A protein has these predicted regions:
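Bacterial N-terminal signal peptides that target proteins for export
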Residues: 2-14
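Sec/Tat signal peptide C-region and signal peptidase I cleavage site
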Residues: 24-29
């Protein structure tokens, strides 16, 4: 498959995976209890204009995220895409379904024991492709990468350690190796930042990196900068900066 086409969907599916942005544990959640948190993300394009907004609804059980539903709306407030994730089978390889209603683009996963069923189509005129891949060690997909960063934040924020993960991209039918390293944030000691990029030097030539910042204490995602999981109106990759609003 030609590299430019591959990186188009790699960027859209992979570099948009952190748009879950939940807290490690809401301040009001208690052990052995089911709680819900609703919050919003605002995505701005490279000109600083609002590209879309995200409405998140996260369900927790015993302090761990169980399910998340994200609804994307354009600047007119019209719903344009939906992402649903279920973390009960695997925290880093959730069963998820994504649909961009503008173009009919779909992709998703379903964890079945030691295997992951994946599917996807690039637009409403394309056939749905289905595959089955083995669930590998250090594999993540979709919003599971955010869960991985949150759970390993202490280790990743120390020194110059570089951690590798295998990111599964349903639209590509395979996984790719990504590397994670800490970013220096001396002016903001209360935050921790990470850079995430492809491990392959060839892929790094055409696939952009992403940067994220977390609150050290709450482990909430504060900002995201990189390629969006929503394509632009011309079905091309768009770079965005997203800031998150949480309930007080």
């Amino acid at each position: 498959m030609p590299l430019p086409k591959m990186t188009k969907y790699l960027n859209a599916a992979t570099f948009g995976m952190l748009l879950l942005a939940d807290a490690a544990l809401p301040a009001w959640a208690t052990t052995n209890n089911r709680q819900e948190e609703v919050f919003q993300g605002v995505a701005r394009d490279e000109r600083g204009e609002i590209a879309y907004t995200e409405e998140h609804r996260m369900i927790y059980q015993d302090g761990r995220p169980q399910r998340n539903e994200t609804r994307y709306r354009d600047v007119q407030g019209q719903e344009i895409a939906v992402l649903k994730s279920n973390f009960t089978t695997h925290p880093y390889v959730p069963s998820y379904s994504f649909e961009d209603r503008r173009f009919g683009r779909q992709d998703g996963t379903f964890v079945d024991g030691a295997w992951v069923k994946i599917y996807g189509r690039t637009d409403q005129n394309a056939p749905v492709q289905q595959e089955r891949v083995r669930l590998e060690e250090n594999m993540v997909t979709g919003q599971g990468l955010h869960m991985y960063l949150r759970d390993h934040m202490d280790q990743l924020s120390k020194g110059d350690e570089i951690r590798q993960v295998r990111f599964l991209v349903p639209l590509e039918g395979r996984d790719f190796v990504f590397r994670i390293r800490r970013l220096d944030t001396p002016s903001e000691p209360q935050t921790v930042g990470f850079n995430i990029e492809a491990d392959s030097w060839l892929l790094r030539l055409v696939a952009p990196k992403l940067e994220v910042r977390y609150d050290r204490e709450t482990r909430r995602l504060l900002s995201y900068r990189g390629a969006s999981n929503l394509l632009n109106a011309d079905q091309g990759v768009q770079n965005v900066t997203i800031t998150y609003r949480y309930p007080s």
